Amino acid sequence: MKPTKQILEDILDEVRPLIGQGKVADYIPALACVPNDKLGIAVFTNDGEMLTAGDATECFSIQSISKALSLTLAMELYQPEELWQRVGKEPSGQAFNSLIQLEMEQGVPRNPFINAGAIVISDMLYSRFSAPKHRLLEFVRKLSGNEHIIYDRVVANSEMDHSDRNASIAYLMRSFGNFDNEVMPVLKNYFHACALSMNCVDLARTFGYLANKGIQPGISEPIVTPMQCKQINALMATCGLYDGAGEFAYRVGMPGKSGVGGGIIAIVPGEMTIAVWSPELDPSGNSLAGTKALELLSERIGRSIF
């Protein structure tokens, strides 16, 4: 079955009672004030159709969803052996901002989707781009077709003001020789990436290339190669939802990437991209109602990579 607007609206009605059972991220003050009752979903198909329901056009902080975009840029800039000697490809099983595993493994992060891995990727982008913030924003605007996407400076500054743990991660990696630049400028770029302000429609369209073998619908040139597309999806399937990746694979069965702003992007290779948003999180830092919505959608339309 193909998704329809009615299916999306029915699913949101079913998951709405979950609101109140999760917790909005409060360790970043600018995120703590987001209303907890927001709920939206968008589906973008490879033939260009967009379906929406709920608060699909309301912007929010995409947070760690941006890590998949930063990885995409890094894969364009670096040879595989350069990239993967600095960050791994394995699930961590630890919290996304853990220091313990990082020290045990000599400053090499388990994967690009935990904080340590994304900070290494930011360091690599900082080495190759003269203006990495501008380059990422330009890239996202191109993919989404929305020239009005911006960084939320309030969120970025809030993260910078509460950056002790991420700074500790960066300095620990630097002590092991896995960091090339000054820490604070790299972190500033990292926090701006997390502070991209987008909505479900923007996100679903932006990640269309991952459902289409690396080619963005509506853009003639490939964004990544088919092999790179497969690799990014594989990493999202195994590592994209922190220490809740296994649970998400079991329930939803799609490659996905979440953020503590309450957004989740999910990919149905060859068919469609789905973006969902609900700010309340489960204990792993993933959207509670958003995960349930994707689970129900997977069941209703009969889609899974497994």
From Swiss-Prot:
Positions that bind substrate: S64, N115, E159, N166, Y190, Y242, V260
According to its UniProt record, the EC number is 3.5.1.2
Enzyme class (EC, first level):
hydrolase
The reactions it catalyses are:
L-glutamine + H2O = L-glutamate + NH4(+)
Keyword Hydrolase found: yes
Complexes and interactors: Homotetramer.
Which protein is depicted?
Glutaminase
Query: Which organism's genome codes for this protein?
Result: Aliivibrio fischeri (strain MJ11)
Gene name, please? glsA
